[in-house]
Amino acid sequence: MIGMSRNLCIVTTIVALGAVSLTARPGPQAPVAPPQGAPQRPPQQPGEISTTITGGGGAAPRLAVPDFIALAADAETTATARLVGQILFDDITFEREFALIPRDTYATIPAAKSFDDVPVDRWRELNADGVVVGTVQKTAGGVHLEVRLVNVRTRIASFSRSYDGSNANPRLFAHTISDELHETQRGLRGVARTKLTFDSDRDGERISGTIENRSVKEIYISDYDGSNQRRVTVTRSLNVMPTWSPDARSIAYTSFKRIVPNIFISNIYQGTMEELTQGGSSNTLAAWSPDGGKLCFVSNRDGNLELYVVNRDGSNLRRVTNHPSADTVPTWSPSGSQLAFVSDRTGPPQIYTIDADGLGLRRVTTSESYADRPTWSPDGREIAYAARTGPGNDIKVVELASGQVRQLTFGEGTNESPSWAPNSRHLSFNSTRSGRTQIFVMGRDGKNVKQITNAGSNFQPNWSK
């Protein structure tokens, strides 16, 4: 039976992890409402501008990103200025849209004390096209930041913004600046304010009464770069396969807290937990529709494992697949008109697509001995998945229009559970390449691999939209 049994069990409240509220203007806006204390954009000021800076000969612009200028000598303001500059450098590096001048070369450049004494000529000696200059000032309510991207050829700011907010999470200022800078300068939606969710056994607890003394797994979230890791569930049971709602406010996941697996939804800001599915059947592997109004999941309620779709409030349950074999691991197309999933209907598990109404079945993987965990790219062009490549698995991507497959990982441990970043330029995945299973991120070309978890073992990441 499907229902929305509302369990007001309070889960861990997540503080200062939302996106930033921005003034209205063309381009993507923050995906979620900001939590208390997040930096706010004041009304657009006459001096705030956005023009495009370019590199020489059509190359990517070369930028310098030194520490921000602390307009007060206290330790907190100084630390914030240093941290925002470093995190902004890291955020810009991650997107690979600019050529960053290494920070260890900045020692020869005199530090500016204000926007009026930026040593533009010295930055030009390092072949910079632009330098990001920012100031941090303490206020009664927190801090005030101003930032400019100065074109070293024209000495004019190509980008100018100001922000006010709490100093509780200074990383969020850097993430906000990075996303706005990429949007205005490169026409790109950045991912610095996005989140990851994953399941982890890091707490070291064991589930009593299980023959194998199974580890407790809880749901965690973090910033895209692995910072600000927070525990979401506190059930002391097995909680796995989390997935973000499109508004990045809720997480659906499979929980064994009542022995039989069912799907729960936790709102990370309200601290509530809802039980979407109930009963004696197995209900697992939830996937949100792009509009957030439905979830697809896997259930054996009618015998074997099939795909079902249900409204967010638990109403209007309908079956999508109907085959004697097992159909599992659904993922929605960005349009919401199709689903990709795994089925063993022709032998070993393979990736298929099907229309959301259950028609139009198509096999996607044709050359794999085993394919699992599909994830549809937000631009709709590709599906990433885990494929058997030997003793372990590797991440591959298939282009839907041509069927062309490219491999992203190559036998460094077992690599599974890919999940796309919302701009289709990066993927997260879990891998055993460093020993225990950990979460990694990489570019869509398989380059710039970075491990972002270390505590315990961590599995099945999902990137917020």
Segments (PLM) and residue ranges:
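Short beta-strand->alpha-helix linker/helix-N-cap micro-motif
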Residues: Q45-P119, V132-K138
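Amphipathic beta-strand/beta-sheet edge segments enriched in Tyr/Trp
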Residues: S114-E180
